[in-house]
Regions:
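Active-site catalytic microenvironments in core metabolic enzymes, especially phosphate/sugar-handling
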Residues: 1-254
Length: 254
């Protein structure tokens, strides 16, 4: 019999919880660690849409990237998503920054999708081990590379375009820290990709001649949800694993 704890222990073995950023929340967040698991649902976020789909599909456990409990809760009342999840009897596990850092995790999946080879970690001060990756691609014009990113991730990119030929690329799925572009540039990056970029970081990228591509938080992390599903399905082949329905949180207007 597979239990919630078994799934959590396996995730801990491939994406150790102790590699998460200090401010993060990973592991079993809601539920019974000894509950039997016959069906797991996967999603980037635990939203009301995701929970409804999980209930409809009779899942025992939801595994998400982003934690449903991130900051201390001041109340736990009916109508609160965490309360509704607990009442449903479904358990929840988060594999957040530990899976960003992991081999085969968020940033390795991004590199594979975009054809980035010979990757190494990009150090940062927030996590015990590097989250971001930097590697090589076949030389391509910056605008053409940005178009490839948009097409591959089914997104719209906002770009600080250096106009240079791109040979070395750094990636950080989700929201890369402010120093990500500077560290990447020092490591020889011609371009960086992340989900969210602040205005002053775009300005800085232009000043140092670095192509900076903002490709969307959801879009840069969501592909890794399928990867985590595959890893768990391969380990526990007697447990049914499904992707839960989750709409993109934003749409393009104009």
């Amino acid at each position: 019999m597979v239990k919630v704890k078994d799934i959590s222990d396996f995730i801990d073995s491939i994406a150790p919880y102790n590699t998460k950023c200090e401010w993060d929340n990973c592991g079993i967040l809601i539920g019974d660690k000894n509950k039997e698991v016959k069906k797991i649902g996967f999603a980037l976020d635990l939203t009301s849409e995701v929970l409804s789909d999980a209930i409809e599909n009779n899942v025992d456990l939801i595994v998400t990237h982003h934690p449903i409990i991130f900051r201390p809760m001041k109340s736990f009342l009916k109508g609160n998503l965490a309360y509704d999840l607990a009442v449903s009897g479904i358990s929840a596990i988060s594999a957040h920054t530990c899976f960003d850092c992991a081999k085969g995790g968020v940033n390795d999946v991004l590199c594979d999708l975009l054809g980035i080879k010979n990757t190494v970690g990009v150090p940062d001060d927030e996590c015990p081990v590097p989250m971001a990756r930097i590697g090589e691609i076949e030389p391509v014009k910056s605008e053409d590379f940005a178009k490839k990113v948009a097409e591959t991730l089914d997104t719209v990119c906002r770009v600080a375009d250096s106009g240079k030929v791109i040979k070395k690329v750094a990636v950080c799925g989700g929201s890369g820290p402010d120093d990500f572009i500077f560290t990447s540039a020092e490591m020889g990056a011609d371009a960086v990709i992340t989900g969210e970029i602040k205005h002053h970081i775009f300005l800085a990228a232009n000043e140092i001649g670095l192509t900076a591509i903002q490709a969307g938080h959801f879009e840069t992390e969501n592909p890794a949800v399928s990867a985590l599903k595959k890893y768990i399905n391969n380990k526990f082949n007697d447990v049914e694993c499904i992707l839960l329905k989750q709409s993109k949180p934003t749409k393009i207007i104009g």
